[in-house]
Regions:
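Conserved acidic segment of CheY-like receiver
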Residues: 3-12
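A short, hydrophobic beta-strand element within the central beta-sheet of small alpha/beta folds
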Residues: 76-85
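Short hydrophobic/Thr-rich beta-strand motif most characteristic of the beta2 strand and flanking loop
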Residues: 27-34
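Alpha4 helix (beta4-alpha4-beta5 surface) of REC/receiver domains from two-component response regulators
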Residues: 86-100
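Output/docking surface of receiver
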Residues: 98-110
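A charged, well-structured terminal subsegment
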Residues: 112-119
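Conserved phosphotransfer microenvironments
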Residues: 52-69
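Acidic, metal-coordinating helix/loop segments flanking the phosphotransfer/catalytic sites
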Residues: 34-50
Length: 119
């Protein structure tokens, strides 16, 4: 069974870009559009997966996200968070909150194919 891939963003263009990369690697991405949807999806996944969080355009503030997902994902899920390079202040805040590997959006796009192939 393929590892679940969840993307938290409201950015429709970026959703399309991530889904294209995923399809090119034979994967499918689920876009989560609400905090309730996130909890239901995480609880409903029998397999651990990859949670990709847009720190600027997530469906709710990432500070709130961090507190909600810690108990749901634990060590089972890998989390990658990304931000625009013009908002570099988000990096330290996200790392402090434990939102996984945190990187600029441009780097995320660059490493995404290899990341998906490694799962």
């Amino acid at each position: 069974m393929a590892v679940p891939l969840l993307l938290l963003t409201k950015d429709l263009l970026f959703i399309t870009k991530v889904k294209e990369v995923a399809l090119a690697t034979g994967r499918q991405v689920v876009t989560v559009k609400s905090d309730k949807g996130l909890e239901e999806t995480l609880v409903g996944c029998a397999e651990p997966g990859l949670l990709m969080v847009d720190l600027e355009k997530a469906v709710f503030p990432f500070e709130q996200l961090a507190s909600r997902i810690q108990g749901l994902i634990g060590e089972r899920w890998q989390c990658v968070s990304f931000f625009s390079h013009v908002h570099a202040d988000l990096e330290d805040r996200a790392k402090t909150l434990g939102l996984g590997d945190v990187m600029p959006r441009s780097r995320f796009v660059k490493v995404l194919p290899d990341l998906l192939r490694s799962l």
